[in-house]
């Protein structure tokens, strides 16, 4: 996901057998996912990166690490926290696509595509086959207007939302878009090729402000249909944060209890509960889902590490505090009314 964000940096080892994708926050190098190499090379590339980090006095942490890195981390007695899962659709067997489930989505799609009802049409744009700057500008306008509306409507922090230019890496992308009866584009889904799983990741999948209800569902369905025709069996929906921390290792029991409590308290105040419900209606394949971890090689994470992670997750501490204060005020008001 984060490779779409140009603010990330790649560290390549001397033998050019592996790489790390990272961003520095609060003098902590936050590595996105696992090292990009075979697991047996983890020690070598991490040792090289450690020597490089010493020049700048950076710490290190991992966000979105897989179970493969988590297993290595436990062997090294590092701290690991399972904070989420990556949800994945299988376009070759998906129950909604095969019309064995999701009747509401199927009926809604047919109504939207009916020329006498919704009048919606679908288009596919693959820049690798030829660039269309006019279309790109039109689709980028959808993304910008959607993001502007989302930010205005957000009463709390928009956690785990990546902000980037969807056209920064066009040769890796396939775009699916919708047009209304007036010919104006009103929906966009961007599919990024992910080589490790020989599949795709979808982000964003959005409707323009004022678009008919169900456009994003139609785009998700269309993405599965397209990948089915391409014989692709892997479509990542992205992170789904857990309401409570999963497996935790490397923390003393008292600190683990405090960490779990703080995480649960924070999660309840973030507007991300709808992710699970949205993903579930498309019937992700549980056999393709994978656990996601935060990993801290230094052991118990310090304040700098936690602040860096909060920033990386796009969590606004100011908005969290505001939400907490509002919640406390509402509780006090309710008590006074009694």
What residues fall within each predicted segment?
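A conserved beta-strand-loop-helix scaffold within acyl/acetyltransferase catalytic domains
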Residues: 1-30, 34, 58, 62-81, ...
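Inter-domain linker/hinge segments that demarcate the starts of reverse transcriptase
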Residues: 41-45
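Short, conserved phosphate-binding/catalytic loop or strand-edge motifs used
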Residues: 89-90
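Short beta-alpha connecting loops at secondary-structure transitions
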Residues: 260-264
């Amino acid at each position: 996901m984060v490779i779409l964000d140009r603010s990330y940096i790649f560290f390549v080892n001397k033998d050019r057998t592996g790489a790390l994708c990272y961003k520095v926050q609060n003098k902590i190098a936050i590595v996105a996912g696992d090292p990009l190499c075979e697991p047996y090379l983890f020690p070598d590339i991490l040792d090289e990166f450690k020597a490089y980090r010493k020049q700048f006095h950076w710490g290190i942490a991992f966000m979105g690490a897989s179970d493969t890195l988590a297993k290595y981390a436990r062997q090294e007695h590092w701290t690991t926290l399972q904070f989420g899962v990556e949800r994945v659709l299988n376009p070759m067997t998906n129950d909604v696509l095969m019309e064995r489930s999701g009747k509401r989505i199927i009926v809604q799609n047919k109504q939207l595509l009916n020329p006498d009802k919704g009048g919606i049409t679908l288009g596919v744009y693959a820049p690798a086959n030829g660039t269309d700057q006019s279309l790109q500008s039109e689709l980028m306008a959808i993304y910008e207007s959607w993001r502007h509306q989302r930010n205005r409507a957000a009463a709390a922090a928009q956690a785990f939302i990546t902000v980037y230019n969807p056209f920064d890496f066009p040769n890796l992308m396939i775009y699916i878009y919708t047009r209304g009866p007036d010919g104006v584009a009103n929906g966009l889904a961007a599919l990024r090729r992910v080589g490790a799983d020989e599949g795709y990741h979808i982000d964003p999948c959005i409707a323009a402000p004022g678009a008919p209800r169900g456009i994003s569902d139609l785009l998700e369905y269309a993405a599965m249909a397209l990948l089915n025709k391409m014989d692709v069996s892997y479509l990542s929906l992205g992170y789904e944060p857990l309401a409570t921390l999963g497996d935790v290792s490397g923390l003393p029991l008292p600190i683990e209890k405090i960490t779990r409590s703080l995480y649960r308290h924070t999660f309840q105040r973030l507007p991300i509960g709808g992710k699970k419900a949205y993903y579930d209606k498309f019937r992700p394949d549980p056999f393709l889902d994978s656990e996601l971890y935060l990993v801290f090689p230094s052991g118990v994470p310090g304040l700098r590490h936690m602040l860096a992670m909060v920033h990386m997750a796009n969590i606004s501490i100011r908005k969290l505090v505001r939400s907490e204060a509002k919640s406390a005020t509402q509780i006090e008001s309710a008590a006074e009314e009694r």
